[in-house]
Amino acid sequence: MKIRLFTWLALLMFAHLPASLAQSACPGIHVQILNIRNSTGTVACALFESPAGFPVEYLHSATNVMVIKIRKSQARCDFEDIPKGTYAMAVVHDENMNGKLDTNWLGIPTEGYGFSNDAKGLLGAPSFSAASFPYDGQNLDMTMSLHY
């Protein structure tokens, strides 16, 4: 009887092990994008490790770039195997999928955009230092809001 009880307890304990392992994400920077106004187009997440090209030249100067399809007005970017360091992130909702942040004739963005630390620039994009954050090599979960 004791052996049977021990067997059942062991089965119950180990039955949950694969589920708990599946829930733990690989170490990296995991970003949930908020305030996406629609599911049209894609979201581009650009991770920069230096001020060079931040944030305008995200396709050419970013350390890592992810382009994610939007589902039900939600998107998530997961950057894994990222070395320790200081980073800044820029996110663009590319509604027409032309690979750039569209603007009106005054230069004001007509598509959604956002920066880490919810950084804002005075008359343009924020500086790298305003948007930068330290990354220690462990799991980092962030949320970023888009502005239209």
Predicted feature locations:
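Bacterial N-terminal signal peptides
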Residues: 7-16
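Sec/Tat signal peptide C-region and signal peptidase I cleavage site
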Residues: 17-24
